[in-house]
């Protein structure tokens, strides 16, 4: 069985193989945290992350606008399969306007970062991953062929080594190039910060009690750290 990659592995390799002027774009899901920690900008204005409202699918349309403003630079959009399925028609826009993009689709089987948040907060999986949702027939999407149907060049890869070679081909391409790769649904980048979002009060399961304790401990730590900073 194919080992599903963690998104950070992919970001590391793409960052290493990019040029200093390349612009990385991301917006929603786990990729925001992973790209911010892993991608290494070497010039000003080469990293665009949509924070605030976690605007799903901004990745492609945002990358299109950035490329229009920077026609001589490579623009690389990192997007999850969930965001891709919500809105992807600007791939077609990029093709018909001759506005070349590189798009990396990380296929982790749904809205995996919210599924991880559900579990992290003491809950259970609920309608985030396609395989654990109320589906009658699970159909895998071929993102490479879908992008190809809109005029882009595309390929699906299954390893970091294949990704590196595909990325080189994408850089040489004159038209929008989409690379699809399967990534892990549950594993996450090790280094991270606490995500302060509400924790379930009910039901009083073992997982829920542990999540509540962690939430309160982190809030107390944050409050004490803020007080210490004010006293300095």
Question: Regions from the language model: what does each represent?
Answer:
Residues 16, 21, 207, 226-227:
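Intrinsic-disorder/low-complexity regions
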């Amino acid at each position: 069985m194919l080992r599903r990659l963690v998104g950070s592995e992919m970001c590391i390799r793409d960052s290493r193989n990019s040029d200093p002027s390349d612009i990385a774009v991301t917006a929603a899901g786990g990729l925001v945290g992973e790209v911010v920690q892993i991608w290494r900008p070497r010039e000003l204005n080469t990293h665009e992350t949509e924070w605030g409202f976690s605007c799903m699918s901004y990745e492609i349309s945002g990358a299109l606008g950035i490329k229009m403003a920077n026609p001589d630079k490579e623009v690389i959009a990192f997007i999850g399969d969930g965001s891709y399925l919500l809105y992807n028609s600007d791939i077609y826009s990029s093709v018909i306007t001759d506005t070349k993009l590189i798009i990396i689709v990380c296929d982790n089987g749904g809205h995996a970062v919210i599924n991880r948040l559900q579990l992290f907060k003491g809950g259970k999986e609920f309608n985030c991953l396609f395989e654990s949702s109320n589906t009658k027939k699970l159909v895998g999407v071929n993102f490479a062929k879908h992008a190809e149907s809109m005029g882009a060049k595309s390929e699906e890869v299954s390893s970091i080594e294949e990704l590196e070679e595909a990325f080189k081909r994408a850089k040489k391409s004159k038209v929008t190039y989409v690379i699809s790769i399967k990534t892990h649904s549950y594993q996450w980048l090790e280094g991270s910060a606490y995500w302060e979002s509400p924790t379930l009060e009910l039901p009083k399961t073992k997982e829920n009690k542990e999540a509540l304790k962690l939430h309160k401990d982190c809030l107390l730590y944050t409050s004490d750290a803020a007080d210490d900073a004010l006293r300095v």
